Amino acid sequence: MQRFGTGSSRSWCGRAGTATIAAVLLASGALTGLPPAYAISPPTIDPGALPPDGPPGPLAPMKQNAYCTEVGVLPGTDFQLQPKYMEMLNLNEAWQFGRGDGVKVAVIDTGVTPHPRLPRLIPGGDYVMAGGDGLSDCDAHGTLVASMIAAVPANGAVPLPSVPRRPVTIPTTETPPPPQTVTLSPVPPQTVTVIPAPPPEEGVPPGAPVPGPEPPPAPGPQPPAVDRGGGTVTVPSYSGGRKIAPIDNPRNPHPSAPSPALGPPPDAFSGIAPGVEIISIRQSSQAFGLKDPYTGDEDPQTAQKIDNVETMARAIVHAANMGASVINISDVMCMSARNVIDQRALGAAVHYAAVDKDAVIVAAAGDGSKKDCKQNPIFDPLQPDDPRAWNAVTTVVTPSWFHDYVLTVGAVDANGQPLSKMSIAGPWVSISAPGTDVVGLSPRDDGLINAIDGPDNSLLVPAGTSFSAAIVSGVAALVRAKFPELSAYQIINRLIHTARPPARGVDNQVGYGVVDPVAALTWDVPKGPAEPPKQLSAPLVVPQPPAPRDMVPIWVAAGGLAGALLIGGAVFGTATLMRRSRKQQ
């Protein structure tokens, strides 16, 4: 028995020692090849951090560092064919129930350039350049987003009104060319020398007319010279993985003047909710940066992110105060889960807009082509207690991760398949929408575009969650117009409960499914709670406790009672002793 006990003790000690060594190795990182996991929790809200709503403007002086983005049209494009995403969403049937009339949609993006097919465009302010009104789009992004939400159709019969459009700006780092001085010299006198005509050639009789030059060709239309244009087309998106195809299309260098028409040529493009008003707020631009980026203790990139978070918070508050009932944020920010910057102001802003101002906030899930936007895990079957994989998040997307107050949109193709390499997954993704085959209004003229200029004479095709969010914002506006009695949170509830769900019911790529405008407008869906669950980080303000009760009378009474008991006990004890003493005598 003793030997058996000793062996068992040694075996237990050996197992304990092995476990200890393994724990030390894991803690020290000696076992490599394990993916990093940053356990994060859903963000909380501090309402006291709400930023003020003053006149829009940048936090620090800004300047333009790059040329504005030019736009184009892919070869072989026929705008008379309806974009695939419009056919997928069955918008013609959805429009039987309304077009979003009376709803204000704020577009917090790179600005929106005025266009004849955006007749209800409202300037909302500029957080990029001081004194701006939000109606300049150097990046050719915000105009695309706004047009997918609210562009009116063109039937070719009604002329569209002309709108003023500002000229494209140029980088402020360039110095203007030096003034040129032109000196005119007098023309020297010319000497004319007359040369006698040569004698007639042999064989020509004297007095016969000398043959002149050949007559010019008869007047009339001539076939124009053909210029074969060359270049390349980049297919998937603005940046990231690219598939480049050559362009070889004949161009006429002398096109004939177009015949006058009543209106622009008809096309099949329209915004999701062509009856809404658009509030344009320019909050970001890749062409602009801080005039002096090397001030303060932070590195320039971190400082820019901090400023972007602050201006986004202020833009959300400003949009809500301007009466927007839908707020679209397609230009989101990504950051590592290891280094999440302070977002108390942004959290307070989305809470204020969604709860206090009853606005539906729609945000993009983020695109893998953008800086710091690394893909998150989708699902870990070994963690059944964490079905949305919060503990596996490596990239935080803001303001998208404020999922209780923001409807975050992932991207799918025209067949409903997730764009897994482009759309950033996350536990905050609630719904999805098409993000390909993008068509929109041009920020440079009165036409349509489906591409932007890229490097090396290439065209980049817009795609991604930015445009998926625009589609959902348009559908949210349709639902708000159809059900004005519903709160913002109830509108979100209706959208996600009428979406076309994935196989698991909900996942981190498409959320609860692909948005379905017709179902959202027609299905019988319970309203649900009017407000989202509260996730407050600041302590609640509780009423002051009542004044403490005056205990002096109680203690006096208790002391008197105790004294009486003592006296009574003494008297009783004395009487008992006297009785015993008498008995003994």
From Swiss-Prot:
GO terms for cellular component: plasma membrane. Its EC number is 3.4.21.-. Residues 163-173 have a biased composition (Low complexity). Residues 1-39 form the signal peptide. One of its GO terms (biological process) is protein processing. It is a single-pass membrane protein. PANTHER family: NEUROENDOCRINE CONVERTASE 1, PROPROTEIN CONVERTASE SUBTILISIN/KEXIN-RELATED. Belongs to the peptidase S8 family. This is Mycosin-5. It comes from Mycobacterium tuberculosis (strain ATCC 25618 / H37Rv). The lineage of its organism: Bacteria, Bacillati, Actinomycetota, Actinomycetes, Mycobacteriales.
